[in-house]
């Protein structure tokens, strides 16, 4: 379903190393021409130091084989540069080894402070350069070690500190360390919000962070709540989505659909989807519009079928397919039941894209698991709904969420009016291109 593929849009906001898993995923799905895609990967990997990966892509393209001597020379050049950079940072690493020594009587904070005061700044820059070089070689774990050192000895007001934060987040994502990635994501977000960027720069930084965070949120246990809190209820990030990347609404909508505990976010989400429908729409956003705006159950049923195809071909959310279908069916069912108190199982089966016996079994399981206040009349083949008033607690939660959004928007407005004229910031992120 190439029409709804977001890989090209998403890759604009991702580091080239983060794009490789997405591009390899597309190759497996065979959505696009394989040769064209492999050529694009080759063009991208050629900008890195990943000699073996480049050689592998050339072989998959059945291009002229690289001479073994040429391949060996490429590896030798990379290793030679690595040795030079490692020699430059040797004094720094010797000090860091002292910190690791359990017999050392020195306090780690005092050692780090001493390093900041006495180390030649060029050595710290060399450590960052080495971390970046290792990263470009695809040696992410070793890169992480040097990035960690840079974070310890660099002052937050250093012009290169932000680049280190971006690099650390990239490495944690690529090594699938989701808990640490979430911590780095929070640290980076706080830094971006407090740094003296120009308005256009901070908008760009937020757009990059939004895309990187999708990778983290859909792989972390708490991510489904956090993505809603950040994308929908932080006005500055919602504004960035609406301004720079409305296609991110697909992932926000998916998070709300699979998160039964956040149904109170539906009203706000649908409002945003309607506002942005002229710039972006896909089967997932249209499913919600059909169901909650138009009450078009037939349209929602058809869109749910399309949603499954979209999700299966989307690297970010393919792992949510089963949950998505289950919760989407439940949403159709709940909405239909608000309108009709007594429904035939055959009618429900049609709306849910299920066979009658499957639909009856599905409803029985809902009732059994205390997720539904209803009774089944097997003789007549009817489902009779009970009353489902909104609990006082849920009403309170909705009001608090609404007040929280208004308060944050007002705070941002006040800060913007009192903020001094911003200075042009240096390089904004872990620069790859």
Swiss-Prot record:
It holds the Pfam family PCI. GO terms for biological process: formation of cytoplasmic translation initiation complex; translational initiation. It comes from the Eukaryota. Coiled coil: none annotated. It comes from Anopheles gambiae. One of its GO terms (molecular function) is translation initiation factor activity. Component of the eukaryotic translation initiation factor 3 (eIF-3) complex, which is involved in protein synthesis of a specialized repertoire of mRNAs and, together with other initiation factors, stimulates binding of mRNA and methionyl-tRNAi to the 40S ribosome. The eIF-3 complex specifically targets and initiates translation of a subset of mRNAs involved in cell proliferation. The keyword Secreted does not apply. GO terms for cellular component: eukaryotic 43S preinitiation complex; eukaryotic 48S preinitiation complex; eukaryotic translation initiation factor 3 complex; eukaryotic translation initiation factor 3 complex, eIF3e; nucleus. Component of the eukaryotic translation initiation factor 3 (eIF-3) complex. Keywords: Cytoplasm, Initiation factor, Protein biosynthesis. The keyword Cytoplasm applies. InterPro entries: eIF3e, eIF3e_N, PCI_dom, WH_DNA-bd_sf. Residues 217-390 form the PCI domain. CDD domains: eIF3E. It is found in: Cytoplasm. Belongs to the eIF-3 subunit E family. This is Eukaryotic translation initiation factor 3 subunit E. Its main location: cytoplasm.
